[in-house]
């Protein structure tokens, strides 16, 4: 990589990335915000639809998680096609199809249709998150990647901050209008904006830096120099798929994702169990853990880039998250302590999440990065099925949320140990 050593070159690079940041990151953040909101708003819908449709906790847990089965089945094909089809067509297709499917969740009538719609939502959203990581790697070098990921994936915590009060407000304010329940309105209102975003993606997302008409020829050359990867460091997808370290990364990610989505889908229920019965109040309480997550992501992404270190910046928060989640089971009956522990636990998990994705993007280079990142994400995202399902099964079997939460607390502990035990130098 060319190292800019004179002040003028450094200033030029800084100005270039300021332009790229403003052009790409806000739009991608908004897109991912709706992706996150549309996959987890079922956690609020549960508060009404479970009674309306007669779901058990186990059925809800499976339905919440089955989204990830559809996602992982179609993720690698989606991402292998992305470099050939282009980001513009890929993101537009994903946004439009998942928006339609999310809005159509209002037609769920029983457990089989619930499972079917959640599965289809996963199929149509497949490839979006790893596709964005690959897309960002086409614009950002290793020294900037963690911060770029932190900004875009800040959409997860923001989705939690906005989604709790928004979903609760829609369910309360619109209940009974036009003969629809509050949860049906919530799915409709939160799904339709994705159609607009799909159209905008077609117009706003350049497939690659060379296609960006808002960059000058000199800026494109400078960016090409910044991102230059020696031919010896480029990999085929087959070589990546045979690399054991890729699967080590994938299992660590599986553990992190299992914990994040177990909390995302069950957080309203966990807080309601502390005696909060007002839906709007519950919405505000569930936003608090995501405020911590947003702050933690920005802080840890920036710190990790500044220190040029990934392993400890990912593992230490995961260790803390395991302890905090386990500790939350000891605070039963104490609303303030429960929210505090869940907030801190959520914060640490999102810290690990944002730093984690800088590791594979530095380890895997060249055209195989799209498939390699998708492979890690595919294996890891299956944790999104098991995490919520484990809490649902444990709740149905024991009558308590605590056993499931304790099992989930072991997940970030395992992730931390895996990350600490494995060093990932740049892959040659």
Show which residues each predicted segment covers.
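Extracytoplasmic gate region of multi-pass secondary transporters
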Residues: 42-43, 241-298, 353, 357
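Helix-breaking motifs and short loop linkers at transmembrane-helix boundaries and internal kinks
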Residues: 54, 86, 107-113, 124, ...
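Conserved MFS/SLC helix-loop-helix module at the cytosolic interface between two early adjacent transmembrane helices
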Residues: 73-112
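Helix-to-loop junctions at the C-terminal end of transmembrane segments
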Residues: 74-86, 296-309
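Cytoplasmic membrane-interface "Motif A"-like loop-to-helix N-cap segments
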Residues: 83-95, 305-318
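Cytoplasmic helix-loop-helix junction between adjacent transmembrane helices
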Residues: 117-154
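Glycine-rich segments within core transmembrane alpha-helices of 12-TM secondary carriers
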Residues: 147-171, 193-194, 377-387
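C-terminal transmembrane helical hairpin of 12-TM major facilitator-type secondary transporters
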Residues: 310-359
């Amino acid at each position: 990589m060319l190292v800019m050593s004179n002040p003028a070159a450094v200033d030029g690079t800084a100005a270039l990335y300021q332009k790229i940041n403003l052009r790409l990151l806000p739009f991608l953040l908004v897109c991912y915000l709706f992706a996150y909101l549309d996959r987890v708003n079922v956690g609020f819908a549960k508060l009404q639809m479970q009674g309306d449709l007669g779901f058990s906790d186990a059925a809800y847990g499976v339905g919440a998680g089955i989204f990830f089965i559809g996602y992982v089945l179609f993720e690698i094909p989606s991402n292998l096609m992305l470099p050939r089809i282009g980001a513009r067509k890929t993101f537009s297709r994903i946004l439009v199809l998942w928006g339609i499917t999310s809005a159509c969740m209002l037609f769920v009538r029983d457990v089989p249709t619930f499972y079917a719609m959640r599965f289809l939502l996963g199929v149509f959203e497949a490839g979006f998150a790893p596709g964005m990581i690959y897309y960002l790697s086409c614009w950002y070098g290793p020294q900037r990647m963690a911060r770029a990921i932190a900004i875009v994936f800040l959409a997860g915590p923001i989705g939690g901050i906005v989604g709790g009060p928004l979903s609760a407000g829609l369910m309360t304010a619109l209940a009974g209008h036009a003969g629809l329940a509050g949860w049906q309105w919530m799915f409709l209102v939160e799904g339709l904006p994705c159609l607009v975003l799909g159209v905008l993606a077609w117009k706003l997302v350049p497939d690659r830096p060379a296609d960006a008409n808002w960059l000058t020829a000199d800026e494109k050359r400078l960016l090409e120099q910044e991102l230059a990867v020696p031919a010896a460091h480029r990999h085929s997808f087959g070589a990546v798929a045979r690399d054991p370290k890729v699967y080590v990364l994938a299992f660590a990610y599986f553990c992190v994702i299992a914990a994040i989505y177990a909390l995302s889908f069950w957080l309203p229920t966990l807080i309601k169990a502390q005696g909060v019965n007002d839906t709007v109040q519950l919405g505000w309480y569930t936003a608090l853990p995501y405020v911590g997550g947003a702050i933690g992501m920005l802080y840890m992404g920036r710190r990790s880039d500044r220190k040029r270190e990934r392993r400890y910046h990912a593992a230490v928060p995961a260790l803390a998250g395991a302890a905090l989640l386990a500790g939350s089971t000891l605070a039963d009956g104490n609303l303030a302590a429960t929210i505090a522990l869940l907030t801190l636990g959520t914060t640490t998990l999102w810290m690990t999440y944002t730093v984690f994705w800088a590791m594979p993007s530095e380890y895997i280079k060249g055209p195989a990065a799209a498939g390699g990142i998708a492979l890690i994400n595919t294996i890891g995202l299956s944790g999104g099925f098991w995490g919520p399902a484990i809490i649902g099964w444990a709740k149905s079997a024991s009558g308590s949320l605590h056993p499931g939460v304790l099992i989930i607390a072991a997940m970030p502990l395992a992730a931390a140990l895996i990350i600490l035990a494995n060093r990932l130098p740049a892959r040659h």
